[in-house]
Regions:
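Short capping segments at the starts of secondary-structure elements
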Residues: 3, 15-19
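Pre-recognition alpha-helix immediately N-terminal to the DNA-recognition helix
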Residues: 6-10
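Key DNA-contact positions within bacterial/archaeal DNA-binding proteins
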Residues: 32
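Short, hydrophobic-biased segments on the C-terminal half of alpha helices
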Residues: 38-39
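A short, conserved structural fragment
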Residues: 42-52
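Conserved segment of winged-helix/HTH DNA-binding domains
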Residues: 55-79
Length: 79
Protein backbone atom coordinates (compact mmCIF):
# COMPACT_ATOMS: atom_id res chain seq x y z
CA UNK A 1 0.00 0.00 0.00
CA UNK A 2 1.39 3.38 -0.89
CA UNK A 3 1.91 6.24 1.55
CA UNK A 4 -1.08 8.32 0.41
CA UNK A 5 -3.50 5.41 0.81
CA UNK A 6 -2.13 4.70 4.29
CA UNK A 7 -2.57 8.34 5.26
CA UNK A 8 -6.15 8.37 3.92
CA UNK A 9 -7.06 5.29 5.97
CA UNK A 10 -5.48 6.73 9.13
CA UNK A 11 -7.30 10.03 8.56
CA UNK A 12 -10.67 8.31 8.14
CA UNK A 13 -10.18 6.08 11.17
CA UNK A 14 -9.30 9.14 13.30
CA UNK A 15 -11.87 11.58 11.92
CA UNK A 16 -14.77 9.43 10.79
CA UNK A 17 -16.75 9.95 7.59
CA UNK A 18 -15.24 12.76 5.52
CA UNK A 19 -15.52 14.31 2.09
CA UNK A 20 -12.78 14.13 -0.50
CA UNK A 21 -11.96 17.80 0.18
CA UNK A 22 -11.72 17.27 3.93
CA UNK A 23 -9.40 14.32 3.44
CA UNK A 24 -7.22 16.28 1.00
CA UNK A 25 -6.92 19.22 3.38
CA UNK A 26 -6.26 16.89 6.30
CA UNK A 27 -3.38 15.04 4.69
CA UNK A 28 -2.12 17.75 2.34
CA UNK A 29 -2.84 16.06 -0.98
CA UNK A 30 -4.53 17.28 -4.14
CA UNK A 31 -8.20 16.45 -4.77
CA UNK A 32 -7.32 14.45 -7.89
CA UNK A 33 -4.81 12.32 -5.96
CA UNK A 34 -7.36 11.75 -3.19
CA UNK A 35 -10.11 10.73 -5.64
CA UNK A 36 -7.79 8.29 -7.42
CA UNK A 37 -6.63 6.68 -4.18
CA UNK A 38 -10.16 6.56 -2.73
CA UNK A 39 -11.29 4.69 -5.84
CA UNK A 40 -8.61 2.06 -5.28
CA UNK A 41 -9.36 1.80 -1.56
CA UNK A 42 -13.10 1.49 -2.23
CA UNK A 43 -12.52 -1.24 -4.83
CA UNK A 44 -10.35 -3.10 -2.30
CA UNK A 45 -13.08 -2.90 0.35
CA UNK A 46 -10.99 -0.81 2.74
CA UNK A 47 -13.09 2.34 2.38
CA UNK A 48 -16.84 2.73 2.01
CA UNK A 49 -18.62 5.54 0.19
CA UNK A 50 -21.92 6.96 1.34
CA UNK A 51 -23.24 9.89 -0.69
CA UNK A 52 -20.33 12.36 -0.81
CA UNK A 53 -18.51 11.00 2.24
CA UNK A 54 -16.02 8.21 2.67
CA UNK A 55 -15.34 6.13 5.78
CA UNK A 56 -13.05 3.32 6.89
CA UNK A 57 -13.81 0.44 9.22
CA UNK A 58 -11.04 -0.55 11.64
CA UNK A 59 -12.24 -4.16 11.43
CA UNK A 60 -12.01 -4.22 7.62
CA UNK A 61 -8.56 -2.63 7.69
CA UNK A 62 -7.35 -5.23 10.21
CA UNK A 63 -8.79 -8.10 8.14
CA UNK A 64 -7.07 -6.86 4.99
CA UNK A 65 -3.80 -6.31 6.87
CA UNK A 66 -3.90 -9.84 8.30
CA UNK A 67 -4.61 -11.33 4.87
CA UNK A 68 -1.78 -9.30 3.36
CA UNK A 69 0.63 -10.43 6.07
CA UNK A 70 -0.43 -14.05 5.70
CA UNK A 71 0.27 -13.93 1.97
CA UNK A 72 3.96 -13.34 2.75
CA UNK A 73 4.44 -15.98 5.42
CA UNK A 74 6.46 -18.96 4.36
CA UNK A 75 5.59 -22.36 5.75
CA UNK A 76 8.61 -24.53 6.37
CA UNK A 77 7.92 -28.23 6.04
CA UNK A 78 10.01 -30.62 8.14
CA UNK A 79 12.19 -32.98 6.06
Amino acid sequence: MNRTRSRIIRFLLRNGPSTCGQIGMGIGASPSAIRRQLGLLTDAGLVQRSSAQFSASAEQVQLHAAAFEASFQVTVMPP
